[in-house]
């Protein structure tokens, strides 16, 4: 989970609350990355609920890869698991039936790492196109 923690006191509070839960075997906290890893047989929804109640902050599931070598794991997993495509649509518009915020997912990543922004959105010459220093600038100006 991605848990915003400011101090060692917050870290201890989160650790104690999660370790008290039934089914939690181990809690690992990386305060630099703001990441909490819970291992055990506890339900994901209950762990999120306890962490949200303790911190009173918005907590989401970790959507970045834990290790760089794990890239591509999700592709292999979903190809094996979901071979048929499920079409959920109403009047041609796709409808989501899953409450991502309640279950700890934010944005559009849903378990995937965040991709880097596309660096070539604006051509470098586009910003100087209407400059007065440019001898070939727009004749309207």
UniProtKB/Swiss-Prot annotation:
Residues 1-59 form the HMA domain. PROSITE patterns: HMA_2 (PS50846). The keyword Metal-binding applies. The keyword Transferase does not apply. PANTHER family: COPPER TRANSPORT PROTEIN ATOX1-RELATED, HEAVY METAL-ASSOCIATED ISOPRENYLATED PLANT PROTEIN 29. Residues 139-141 form a propeptide. GO terms for molecular function: metal ion binding. This is Heavy metal-associated isoprenylated plant protein 29. The gene is HIPP29. Keywords: Lipoprotein, Metal-binding, Methylation, Prenylation. The modification Cysteine methyl ester is found at residue 138. A lipid is attached at residue 138 (S-farnesyl cysteine). Pfam families: HMA (PF00403). Heavy-metal-binding protein. Belongs to the HIPP family. A metal cation binds at residues 7, 10.
